[in-house]
């Protein structure tokens, strides 16, 4: 996909393995429990989410019922989508038809709307599940007038991004007890643009789970990403904090956090309880007795220089300001700040193996 298309339309298509993980995290799993439940992808693209959804629905239905006519009727009733681009919309319909053909279903009158999701209200309060990968595009890059964007509460702060509006749109579509699950940039956790959204989250307490993708980059568009799960339930104060383990391609649970634990100065931070407690003491204390910052620096290649390094030589402790997480950084410099020679580094076998890999 061209960079201009990403910049102006925000279309970034989702890999199949992530689609499956997101649906699982949302609770839309292949079982009788999803039958008769309304689900929508309100920026459905070519149907990455909808194709997996339809496949799961068909398999769950056929496990206990061979009535193809009834299956067709339920697909037309419970599966929904919206796509603004005409060509992409047509490819979505074609892809969905190919999926149901495997189950002996033809001529489905899909409830997929070609249109602007920001102007469509027929799904408000009616969805059991809202899922997807909403468009990432700053309002000043929109190809059309962004007055539709600015009417949303979540757009009232900073240089807003379209995906923030889709959070508000998705929550509006949920019925009582419904679930929303998106993969988006993680910037809403602490950006000025995300302040209105965070304020609403604290008020309603709909956020129930996150998956921090960390340095793993599932898209060509370079950005830190996060899977967020919201549920329209009352009296919730539990947020499941997970990370994505790219080594095994699985979501791994780290901790269960409260709303108080993730908030510092009206911003959200994600980590384990101990790390968050330390970060809160640092951020809220007027004293510098906890941590003295000697230097701030940018590596421009965190995947190599920062993380769980397989050696201790030539490393220093670092605190990542954006996340509040402690780690270690490869620091191949002497006390005067001069780079160490290759000959000196070569004396440490573990460092050599790491750099060669």
Predicted regions mapped to residue ranges:
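Short coil/turn motifs at beta-sheet boundaries
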Residues: 72, 220-223
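SAM-dependent methyltransferase catalytic region
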Residues: 1-210, 215, 227-229, 233-238
């Amino acid at each position: 996909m061209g960079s201009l298309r990403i910049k102006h339309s925000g279309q970034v298509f989702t890999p199949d393995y992530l689609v499956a993980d997101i649906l699982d995290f949302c609770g839309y799993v292949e079982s009788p429990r999803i039958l008769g439940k309304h689900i929508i992808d309100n920026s459905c693209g070519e149907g990455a989410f909808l194709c997996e959804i339809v496949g799961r629905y068909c398999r769950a239905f056929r496990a206990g019922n061979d009535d193809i006519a009834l299956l067709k009727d339920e697909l037309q009733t419970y599966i929904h989508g919206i796509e603004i681009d005409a060509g992409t919309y047509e490819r979505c319909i074609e892809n969905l038809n190919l999926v149901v053909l495997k189950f002996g279903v033809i001529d489905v009158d899909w409830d997929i709307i070609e249109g602007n999701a920001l102007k469509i209200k027929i799904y408000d309060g009616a969805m059991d599940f809202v899922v997807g990968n909403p468009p990432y595009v700053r309002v000043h890059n929109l190809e059309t007038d962004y007055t539709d964007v600015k009417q949303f509460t979540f757009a009232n702060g900073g240089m807003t991004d379209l995906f923030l509006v889709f959070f508000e749109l998705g929550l509006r579509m949920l019925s009582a007890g419904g679930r929303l699950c998106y993969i988006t940039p993680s910037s809403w956790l602490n950006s000025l643009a995300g302040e209105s959204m965070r304020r609403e989250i604290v008020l309603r307490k709909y956020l129930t789970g996150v998956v921090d993708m960390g340095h793993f980059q599932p898209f060509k568009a370079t950005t830190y990403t996060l899977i967020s799960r919201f549920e329209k339930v009352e009296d919730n104060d539990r947020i499941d904090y997970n990370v994505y383990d790219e080594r095994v391609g699985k979501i791994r649970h780290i901790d269960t956090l409260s709303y108080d634990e993730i908030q510092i100065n009206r911003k959200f931070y994600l980590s384990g309880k101990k790390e968050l407690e330390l970060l809160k003491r640092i951020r809220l204390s007027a004293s510098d007795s906890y941590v003295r910052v000697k230097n701030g620096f940018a590596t421009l290649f965190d995947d190599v220089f920062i993380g769980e390094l397989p050696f201790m030589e030539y490393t220093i402790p670092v605190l990542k300001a954006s996340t509040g997480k402690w780690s270690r950084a490869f620091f191949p410099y002497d006390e005067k700040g001069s780079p160490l020679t290759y000959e000196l580094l070569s004396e440490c076998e573990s460092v050599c193996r790491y750099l060669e890999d």
